[in-house]
Structure formats: C-alpha cells, structure tokens
C-alpha cells in the first residue's frame, strides 16, 4: 500500500486526495486541530503514507519549533527523524533537503542547515527557488560572496521576490559602515 512518493503524479492522483481529505486537512496543516485525533497523529499518518510530503514536513517542522511534544516511545520520536526518513526514502528530493535546512536553521543548527542547503543545490542547481532560499541563508551566515552567486542564478532566471537583493544590499551597507 505505501509509502508513496509525493512527487509521483500517479500516487498524487490515486492516493493523496484520500490522505489529505481525512488526515492532512487545512486545520492539521496549520496545527489548529487534528482531523481524526491529534494534530501529531494526523501528521504522522500523512508522513507514513507520503514520507516526502513537502507541506506535511513543513508542518511537522513548525510543530517542533513551536514546542510540540513527540512521544518518546513512538517509532519516529522527533521532527529530525521524519526528515531523515524522507531523505532515506527519496534522497533525490531537493525540496525535502531545503525544508529540512530551513528547520535546522530556525532551530539554530547552522552547520547542519548548510549541509542540507548544499545537498539541495547539488540536486537542483538551476532551481530558482532553491537558489533564492539558500541565498537568504548565506546572507544570514555572512557569506555574501556565495549569496551573490545564488542570487544571480535566481534573479537571472526570473525569481520575482526582491527580498534576497534587499538582504544582500543591507549586508553590504553594514559591511561598508563597519569598514569605516
């Protein structure tokens, strides 16, 4: 029966609607309340069926960052375990690496976040979204040279949001004022 690849169009059409209708509802995704039980229970069901379900991984990351509790005796006792399972299931899914990197960075694990961003960039070097998000990370950790390169890829290929450009400009201005 499962697990299913979230990116597979056949599985998305045949199996995803049932999982999302009963377990990954808008209330579960937003962590407001569970559909068939607890929020965590519905997220667990969704991620058992689709280990690399991008939106559910974002939700489990938010759940953990907001202090949600995982059962110690559960077979997947932490958000990290869900990400590790998703990566083991489909190591070529660059989006999973980016979502995990974002989670790690927000949690303060900069070195591990960097590894996941690098993995995502290696899997999808031309992805404007991945270049943009990784560029934001590199600005935040002070690697402006790398951030500029990633921004160039993103913006040369049509990325519409100006946030990375603005962050780079602000970081450059701060560098110049410190140099004075």
Where are the model-predicted features located?
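N-terminal leader/linker segments that initiate helical-solenoid repeat arrays
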Residues: 1-44, 49
């Amino acid at each position: 029966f499962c697990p299913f690849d979230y990116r597979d169009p056949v599985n998305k059409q045949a199996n995803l609607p049932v999982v999302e209708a009963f377990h990954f509802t808008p209330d579960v995704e937003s962590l407001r309340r569970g559909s068939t039980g607890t929020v965590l229970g519905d997220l667990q069901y969704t991620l058992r069926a689709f280990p690399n379900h991008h939106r559910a991984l974002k939700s489990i990351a938010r759940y953990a960052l907001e202090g949600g509790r995982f059962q110690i005796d559960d077979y997947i006792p932490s958000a990290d375990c869900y990400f590790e399972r998703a990566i083991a299931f489909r190591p070529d899914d660059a989006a999973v690496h980016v979502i995990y990197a974002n989670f790690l960075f927000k949690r303060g694990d900069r070195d591990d976040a960097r590894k996941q961003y690098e993995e995502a960039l290696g899997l999808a070097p031309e992805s404007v979204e991945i270049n943009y998000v990784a560029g934001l990370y590199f600005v935040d950790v002070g690697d402006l040279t790398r951030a500029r390169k990633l921004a160039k890829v993103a913006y040369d290929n049509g990325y519409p949001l100006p946030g990375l450009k603005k962050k780079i400009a602000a970081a450059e201005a701060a560098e110049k004022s410190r140099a004075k």
